[in-house]
């Protein structure tokens, strides 16, 4: 299929030539997210708007370039061009996903892209016909379920012994306007999403149906798809207005080696609604609301992916899954426990360049998501492994007990040796293993064991502490997540309050709502908002931070406590060592006094051996089971290998067939270029008609030549049959002749009875030959040229046969029209020669009949001669002249022998000519076969030419009907859409007038409101500042008054002090010891009062200055009294603007009513027109499909006609080679054809037979006339 290409001076790319998708089997081992880009073909609407201009260029099967300014190159896991079929895409993306589900991984696949980019076609496709093999447009979801249940069936067959059981449950939901709807139960609406530890994220009360095969799953899919919200927009006639999620829960249970396994996985197939722009889609009313919700959820999806990338880079800690129902439901698929495939659908058209770039960027971000996929499997009842573990533990306990006992014995013996008791020394000499050196070594080993035990205890405690800390952190994190969700909910509530407030203000502005009701609702909303803020305050982020710090401090305290406890643990460890030493001494003493320790040791060894044997037996059983499982796996692998090899062979054959078909299609396209383009269709039709006429003319001519050749071949076949009969007659004649010779020899020895019979036969032959010769005008003594030429031709016939075979094998020249004319002339000549040959054959048959007649007459005459001879002999017996008669009889016998010799020579020549004639018959057989083949091919060509002509006429008639249907369609379309266009134009005109007035009024209103708010703010600021200034003035005045009072009091005190000092100075100084301290205290008091007075004066001065400044400010504020006037004027202007807006709204309402009435009047007639228009569209589509089918049939017939023409040319070349090779090339001989040779041979045969007959007749006459 040729690729569409378009050139663009501004970066328009061209269509790629097509890249083969390659599956990587090891991809899912290292990755959990796969991103696939799928490019859809250009639509007819895009071609009509932008032509073949493209905005993307594919570089390989993993890279694509956006050809805008500047160019951007993107690399993904797979890039599928517009030529990739649904089957190929499923093999590289759908099959691995099913395999992951069967292995126990959660899997998810969703399609992303703008509206009309092919998401629903990719995910669902044509689901009306189910999962039939011939349905090439079947999407991912049906193919996934078909492959899934095939895998389940194979797993059941392979693992029959494990009692494998599968259970599949399907559910189908859609998210429409942020509400979850159950597509399998339309009565269930507005379902809720729940999350718990057991089920994870799930939808409450969602319908689940258990399915057992692909047909039942498809039935659920079709039933749910029929309930899905779909509407038409400017960009897509069947645009999905919701997100759909088809979920399949797969559970499997089996038993293996005493273990009950339970594996489960979840498969999500998501079809997202397309992002769209209001300008491009023309969404209004309900469609606009749907588009808003769709874009909101898709933007949340992009935000979630961005935050996931940030989390993987340790730059963020929060992912807003709960901001939309879609992301909350797909929480596990995005950054969770799942293997996810994202198929980003894009349009290559230049008119969708911005949307395509946005989709490519989204897919590039999605490549960096990191999921943590694990196998969901549980196991229970592992009895055998538990028994093995028990045996291991028993053996380990026995070994440790033995070590402990030996250490205790050594410690006891060592202590006894130190005490130097005689019994102990004697026992040590007998054992020879409890020396002081060995004691030190075992003591060191014991310390090592103790240290290892202590370390194990410590690790166990640390693990328990960490586990508790993690559990506490998890609980805190869950609480924090709950708090964060509540915060988000409160913020949304506040946002909703604000939106409602804005709407009410708009209603108050437009006069639809009174001020009192507005204030009441405002008060209620404010109360609710205050409650929400209080709740938010209770869940303050600072509280969260403090809680986390509290946990951190608790962890630090635990670590410190661990360090403190280690000292106590060391003390306890020392105590345990001391106790162990004492225990060892006691055991050593007990061991020394036991009578038969060896028997106990042997019994202990026997028990340990029995336990070890039991352990070995269990281990052997385990090994046998493992070997059996490995054998099963090996057989399964071998079967899989054989299946893969068979599949590879099948694919190789399919590839070869595809290549062959591709080459044939290219050859046909080079010979007959019948393009579907309507602009070039008339020229292509003219060329095709000319070619068909030329082929028909050539075929007719060849047919005439073939008919001539076929007639000649039939005549040759009849001649060959007659020649065969003649040869048989000749053989019978030769046998009769030989029998006559044998009888003659016998009679020569014993008498003369056979002579009359031989003479009769000769007479019959000579009469037959003579008659034949006379009939052909040939005298007995004449020898025609053919008698001398034919022997040479007999030798050259073998050379001619070899030339024929060489010509059939080596002749490679093309058969031209001139050669066809020459062959036709040669065939005409051979036909004439064949007629001559048939005449000769009829003459030969007449001669044979005459020969038979004369043969019977001769036999009768010989009978009478016999009787005469008997009478003569009887007379001669009695006569004395016996000797003379005997002499005459001997001379007659010698003459008869000579005649027989000549007849034998003639018959031998006849036999040779018959052999040559048989070669000619074989040649005629070859000619007949070649001509028959040519006749069949000619008849087939004529039949195909007639069919081709008939199909061409049908296609022309269909095209005429198509043009008529298109004209009627255009007429109905113009008639149907003209009222819409008129209403639309009227709407645009009135909307422009009213809209401009409304926009100007609204802009002016906003400006006035801003000025009014600014002036009101200034007024409030001035009033607040004035109030503060007056308050400060009052405070300063009161302060000044207080300072003046204090100053007066200080003045009075100062005067009193001066008076006292003056009085003291006037007192008698007779008592100086008492007056000095009093004077000093008064003076210091006076100084202090003076200082305080100075301070008061400075403070008073400062307060007065501040008072002057405040008074100046108050005076300056009093100058802004004109603000109230400005505010009043602006309020009046705002009221005028509101009235203007109301007028514009009324005009808009009147305009809408007018348009509605006009539309209702026009809509009455549009229903009938719509039915006619749809019927006309259906007819046009039907005619186009028929024309396409006719064109395909014409192409197929043209290819068949070319093949038959080539075969016919080859057959004609073979026939021409036969004719040319049989024509002699010797210039000395006459240019004779094969029929001439046969004629000459027959003439020679007739001559020889005539001569033989003549000889026999002469002999007979001599005998009859003695």
Swiss-Prot record:
User: Which family does the entry's similarity section mention?
Assistant: Belongs to the TRAFAC class myosin-kinesin ATPase superfamily. Kinesin family. KIN-12 subfamily.
Listed binding positions for ATP are 113-120
Please, which domain of life does this record's source organism belong to?
Eukaryota
Q: Which PANTHER family match?
A: KINESIN-LIKE PROTEIN KIN-12D, KINESIN-LIKE PROTEIN KIN-12E
Q: List the Pfam families.
A: Kinesin
* A GO biological-process term: spindle assembly
Which Gene Ontology molecular-function terms are recorded?
A: ATP binding; microtubule binding; microtubule motor activity
Which Gene3D superfamilies does this entry report, sorted A to Z? Answer: Kinesin motor domain
Query: Kinesin motor domain spans which residues?
Result: 32-369
Which Gene Ontology cellular component annotation is one that this UniProt entry carries? microtubule
For this UniProt record, give its keywords in alphabetical order, as a comma-separated list: ATP-binding, Coiled coil, Microtubule, Motor protein, Nucleotide-binding
Instruction: List every stretch annotated Disordered.
Output: 1-22
Q: Which InterPro entries match?
A: KIF15/KIN-12 (IPR044986), Kinesin_motor_CS (IPR019821), Kinesin_motor_dom (IPR001752), Kinesin_motor_dom_sf (IPR036961), P-loop_NTPase (IPR027417)
Protein's name in the database: Kinesin-like protein KIN-12G
Q: Please tell me whether the keyword Phosphoprotein is annotated for this protein.
A: no
Question: Which segments does the entry list as coiled coil?
Answer: 613-668, 817-854, 1029-1060, 1084-1120
């Amino acid at each position: 299929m040729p690729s569409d290409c378009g050139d663009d001076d501004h970066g328009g790319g061209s269509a790629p030539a097509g890249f083969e998708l390659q599956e990587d089997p090891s991809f899912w081992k290292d990755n959990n997210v796969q991103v696939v880009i799928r490019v859809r073909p250009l639509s007819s609407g895009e071609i009509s708007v932008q032509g073949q201009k493209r905005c993307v260029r594919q570089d390989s099967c993993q890279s694509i370039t956006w050809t805008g300014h500047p160019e951007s190159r993107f690399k993904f896991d797979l890039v599928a061009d517009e030529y990739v079929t649904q089957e190929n895409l499923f093999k590289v993306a759908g099959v691995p996903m099913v395999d992951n589900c069967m292995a126990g991984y959660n899997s998810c696949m969703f399609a992303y892209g703008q509206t009309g980019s092919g998401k629903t076609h990719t995910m669902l496709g044509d689901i009306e016909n189910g999962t039939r093999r011939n349905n090439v447009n079947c999407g991912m979801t049906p193919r996934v379920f078909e492959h899934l249940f095939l895998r389940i069936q194979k797993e059941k067959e392979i693992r029959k012994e494990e009692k494998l059981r599968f259970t599949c449950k399907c559910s189908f939901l859609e998210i429409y306007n942020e509400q979850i709807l159950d597509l399998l139960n339309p009565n269930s609406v507005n379902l809720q999403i729940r999350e718990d530890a057991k089920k994870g994220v799930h939808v409450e009360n969602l319908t689940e149906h258990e399915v057992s095969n692909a047909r039942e799953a498809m039935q659920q899919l079709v039933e749910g798809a029929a309930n899905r919200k779909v509407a038409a927009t400017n960009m897509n006639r069947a645009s999905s207005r919701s997100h759909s999620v088809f979920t399949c829960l797969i559970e499997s249970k089996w038993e293996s080696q005493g273990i009950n396994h339970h594996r489960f996985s979840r498969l999500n197939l998501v079809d997202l609604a397309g992002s769209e722009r209001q300008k491009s889609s023309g969404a209004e009313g309900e469609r606009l609301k749907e588009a808003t919700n769709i874009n909101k959820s898709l933007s949340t999806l992009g935000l979630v992916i961005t935050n996931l990338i940030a989390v993987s880079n340790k730059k963020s800690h929060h992912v807003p899954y709960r901001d939309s129902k879609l992301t909350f439901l797909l929480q596990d698929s995005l950054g969770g426990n799942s293997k996810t495939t994202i198929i980003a659908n894009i349009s290559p058209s230049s008119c969708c360049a911005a949307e395509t770039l946005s989709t490519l960027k989204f897919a590039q971000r999605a490549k960096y998501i990191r999921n943590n996929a694990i196998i969901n499997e549980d196991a229970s009842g592992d009895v055998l492994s538990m028994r093995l573990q028990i045996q291991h533990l028993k053996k380990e306990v026995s070994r440790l007990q033995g070590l402990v006992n030996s250490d205790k014995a050594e410690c006891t013996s060592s202590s006894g040796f130190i005490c130097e008791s005689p019994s102990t020394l004697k026992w040590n000499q007998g054992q020879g293993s409890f020396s002081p050196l060995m004691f030190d070594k075992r003591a060191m080993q014991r310390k090592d064991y103790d240290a290892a035990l202590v370390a194990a205890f410590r690790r166990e405690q640390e693990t328990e502490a960490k586990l508790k800390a993690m559990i506490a952190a998890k609980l805190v994190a869950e609480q924090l997540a709950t708090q964060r969700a509540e915060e988000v909910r409160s913020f949304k509530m506040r946002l909703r309050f604000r939106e409602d407030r804005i709407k009410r203000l708009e209603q108050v502005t437009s006069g639809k709502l009174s001020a009192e009701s507005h204030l009441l609702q405002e008060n209620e909303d404010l109360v609710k908002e205050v409650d929400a803020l209080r709740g938010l305050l209770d869940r303050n982020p600072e509280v969260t931070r403090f809680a986390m710090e509290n946990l951190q401090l608790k962890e630090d305290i635990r670590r410190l406590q661990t360090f403190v406890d280690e000292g106590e643990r060391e003390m306890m460890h020392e105590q345990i060592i001391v106790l162990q030493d004492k225990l060892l001494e006691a055991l050593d003493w007990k061991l020394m006094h036991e009578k038969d320790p060896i028997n106990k040791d042997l019994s202990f060894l026997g028990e340990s051996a029995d336990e070890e044997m039991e352990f070995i037996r269990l281990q052997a059983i385990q090994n046998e089971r493992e070997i059996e499982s490995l054998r099963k796996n090996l057989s399964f692998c071998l079967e899989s290998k054989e299946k893969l090899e068979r599949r590879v062979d099948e694919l190789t054959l399919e590839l070869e067939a595809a290549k062959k078909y591709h080459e044939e299609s290219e050859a046909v396209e080079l010979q007959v270029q019948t393009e579907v383009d309507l602009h070039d269709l008339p020229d292509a039709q003219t060329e095709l008609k000319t070619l068909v006429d030329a082929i028909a003319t050539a075929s007719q001519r060849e047919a005439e030549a073939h008919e001539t050749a076929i007639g000649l071949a039939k005549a040759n076949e009849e001649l060959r049959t007659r020649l065969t009969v003649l040869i048989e007659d000749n053989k019978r004649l030769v046998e009769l002749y030989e029998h006559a010779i044998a009888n003659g020899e016998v009679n020569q020895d014993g008498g003369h009875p056979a002579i009359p019979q031989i003479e009769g036969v000769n007479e019959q032959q000579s009469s037959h030959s003579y008659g034949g010769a006379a009939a052909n005008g040939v005298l007995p003594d004449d020898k025609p040229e053919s008698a001398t030429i034919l022997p040479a031709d007999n030798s050259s016939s073998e050379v001619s046969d070899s030339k024929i075979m060489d010509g059939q094998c080596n002749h490679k020249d093309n058969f031209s029209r001139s050669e066809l004319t020459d062959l036709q002339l040669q065939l005409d000549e051979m036909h004439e020669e064949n007629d001559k040959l048939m005449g000769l054959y009829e003459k030969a048959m007449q001669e044979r009949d005459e020969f038979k007649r004369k043969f019977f007459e001769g036999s009768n005459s010989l009978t009478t001669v016999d009787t005469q001879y008997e009478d003569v002999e009887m007379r001669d017996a009695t006569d004395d002249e016996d000797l003379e008669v005997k002499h005459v009889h001997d001379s007659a016998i010698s003459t008869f022998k000579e005649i027989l010799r000549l007849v034998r020579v003639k018959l031998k020549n006849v036999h040779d000519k018959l052999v040559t004639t048989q070669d000619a018959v074989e040649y005629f057989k070859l000619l007949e076969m070649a001509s028959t083949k040519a006749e069949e091919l000619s008849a087939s060509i004529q039949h195909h030419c007639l069919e081709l002509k008939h199909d061409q006429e049908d296609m022309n008639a269909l095209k005429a009907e198509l043009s008529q249907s298109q004209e009627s369609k255009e007429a109905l379309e113009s008639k149907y859409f003209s009222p819409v266009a008129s209403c639309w134009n009227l709407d645009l005109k009135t909307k422009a007038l009213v809209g401009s007035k409304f926009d100007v009024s609204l802009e002016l209103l906003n400006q006035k409101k801003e000025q009014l708010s600014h002036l009101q703010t200034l007024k409030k600021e001035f009033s607040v500042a004035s109030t503060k200034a007056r308050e400060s003035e009052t405070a300063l005045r009161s302060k000044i008054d207080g300072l003046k009072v204090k100053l007066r009091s200080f003045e009075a005190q100062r005067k009193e002090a001066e008076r006292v000092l003056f009085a003291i100075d006037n007192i008698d100084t007779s008592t100086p010891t008492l007056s000095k301290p009093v004077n000093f205290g008064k003076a210091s008091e006076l100084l202090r009062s003076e200082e305080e007075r100075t301070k008061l004066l400075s403070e008073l001065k400062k307060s007065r200055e501040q008072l002057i400044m405040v008074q100046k400010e108050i005076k300056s504020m009093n100058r802004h009294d004109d603000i109230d006037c400005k505010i009043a004027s602006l309020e009046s202007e705002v009221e005028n603007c509101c009235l203007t807006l109301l007028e514009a709204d009324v005009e808009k309402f009147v305009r809408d009513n007018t348009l509605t009435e006009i539309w209702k009047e026009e809509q009455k007639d549009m229903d009938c027109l719509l039915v006619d228009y749809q019927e006309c569209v259906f007819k046009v589509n039907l005619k186009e499909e028929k024309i396409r089918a006719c064109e395909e049939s014409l192409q197929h017939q043209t290819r068949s006609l070319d093949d038959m023409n080539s075969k016919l040319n080859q057959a004609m070349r073979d026939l021409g080679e036969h004719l040319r090779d049989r024509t002699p090339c010797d210039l000395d001989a006459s240019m004779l054809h094969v029929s001439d040779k046969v004629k000459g041979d027959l003439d020679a045969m007739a001559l020889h037979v005539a001569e033989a007959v003549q000889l026999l007749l002469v002999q007979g006459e001599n005998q009859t006339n003695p």
